[in-house]
Amino acid sequence: MLKIIIPTMMLMPLTWMSKPNMIWINTTAYSLLISLISLSFLNQLGDNCMSLSLLFFTDSLSAPLLALTTWLLPLMLMASQFHLSKEPLARKKLYITMLILLQLFLIMTFTATELIMFYILFEATLVPTLIIITRWGNQTERLNAGTYFLFYTLVGSLPLLVALLFIQNNMGTLNFLMIQLWAQPLPSSWSNTLLWLACMMAFMVKMPLYGLHLWLPKAHVEAPIAGSMVLAAVLLKLGGYGMMRITALLSPLTSFMAYPFMMLSLWGMTMTSSICLRQTDLKSLIAYSSVSHMALVIVAILIQTPWSYMGATALMIAHGLTSSVLFCLANSNYERTHSRTMILARGLQVLLPLMAAWWLLASLTNLALPPTINLIGELFVVMASFSWSNITIILMGTNIIITALYSLYMLITTQRGKYTYHIKNIKPSFTRENALMTLHLMPLLLLSLNPKVILGPIY
């Protein structure tokens, strides 16, 4: 594991020691190398000593998320160049350092062996994210968004700490590998119900569950581009990862406790998709679509069958790349028109034909068109929930239709129609942006050729 963690740490001195004209090139190139190293953790045997130590370990659930995290850093750096071009040098370096620090915390969170260690790192990711949102966001509402983000996550995860300490006292260990061997079945009683809620609530807020999702659109809309990308692509996955890990402790109780949360997720999924149809703000629309996709993942994890777990892991990876590319496209519009309102930036197909192609591809991946990995994830989740209960297909089907509707609505509003006069002389799309979109969409298509590397621990 150190072969990823130590190079990531050394990216920080690299940033501060680089010449001013080499900052972006150096950090992007080296972070890309690190992300290529992390690919070696995919598809490995479960029992090799490479992936196991007392502090960090990878298995087939954390390896795909680890690869996603490391893959995202070079993409975030590529996306932020224009956004920071007018900032002074020290501030650019600080921004890059914050991204690297966040990356470091995320890598360690996904590979921690102990639940307390996982909790500490889970909370540590808040600090760089908060600084990125509140320091480099675009509007003054970013302070409000930062407060929402911080307090929702903190209040949600405090009971988890108490629950973990209680479990530590009872079991004597919180090691992930020991838990799977030693976990005692939890009978349903009042105290165990509260324990279950305390363990799950932190991750439900992070996912976010419908009803606890108010921080997400705010944080997404106000964050700078790299903040939005890492929030959508990796921070939401912490919730899913934590839920999958901690259900080993709560085994028989989950099947009894999951009903209200599954109903809420299924209902919230349809509701947030419908909210997307009413949005005027482009980033807000993408944020709400994230909520609806993550609701699918919550349902899949709570069903707790091997099939649904595979669907959940595939969907998490797919959603990470898809929402990230959509935020990049929204940002490229924002950099040219200085507005997130879709009606003000319409008809861009005439002016940016290549960007329109990227918009089309991104919208189609968002509505889970084959041959993308999104389809595989959604298909698995829908089939697993259908075999769990036939009635869920009503809400699932409705959600799939509404997803197609808002994806096409977003595409048509931004690309079609008569363009407004204030955007006649905008810049053409840069090579940097085209490379960025390619690096997002390539994995989505390539993974569908060999999906077993991201289908999680059960495959």
Curated annotation (Swiss-Prot):
- Which reactions does this protein catalyse? a ubiquinone + NADH + 5 H(+)(in) = a ubiquinol + NAD(+) + 4 H(+)(out)
Gene Ontology biological-process entries: electron transport coupled proton transport; mitochondrial electron transport, NADH to ubiquinone; mitochondrial respiratory chain complex I assembly
**Keywords from the named record:** Electron transport, Membrane, Mitochondrion, Mitochondrion inner membrane, NAD, Respiratory chain, Translocase, Transmembrane, Transmembrane helix, Transport, Ubiquinone
Into which EC class is this enzyme placed?
A: translocase
What would be one Pfam family of this protein?
Oxidored_q5_N
Q: Where in the cell is it found?
A: Mitochondrion inner membrane
What does the record give as the function of this protein?
Core subunit of the mitochondrial membrane respiratory chain NADH dehydrogenase (Complex I) which catalyzes electron transfer from NADH through the respiratory chain, using ubiquinone as an electron acceptor. Essential for the catalytic activity and assembly of complex I.
Q: What is the name attached to this protein's record?
A: NADH-ubiquinone oxidoreductase chain 4
Q: From which source organism is this entry?
A: Halichoerus grypus
